[in-house]
């Protein structure tokens, strides 16, 4: 099993953690329906780039 030989400093720990932050999802508003959805994803009502691509699910 791997065991470190020397203790990592606070600086090295911080450098490693600098990439762990989460970013907010990029949201768009559909031009035809006004539905808010994630960019480059189909909106919940089945539209993508102004065209109906799939049938909307009934919930």
UniProtKB/Swiss-Prot annotation:
Entries under InterPro entries matching the protein: Ribosomal_bL32, Ribosomal_bL32_bact, Ribosomal_zn-bd
Signal peptide start and end residues: none
Compositionally skewed regions (Basic residues) per UniProt: 7-16
Region (Disordered): 1-59
Pfam families: Ribosomal_L32p
Keywords on record: Ribonucleoprotein, Ribosomal protein
Ranges of biased composition (kind: Low complexity): 21-33
Keyword field contains Ribosomal protein: yes
Superkingdom classification of source: Bacteria
Molecular function in Gene Ontology: structural constituent of ribosome
GO biological process, one term: translation
Cellular component aspect of the GO annotation: large ribosomal subunit
Family per similarity comment: Belongs to the bacterial ribosomal protein bL32 family.
HAMAP family per the UniProt record, alphabetical: Ribosomal_bL32 (MF_00340)
Name of the protein in question: Large ribosomal subunit protein bL32
Organism listed in the record: Marinobacter nauticus (strain ATCC 700491 / DSM 11845 / VT8)
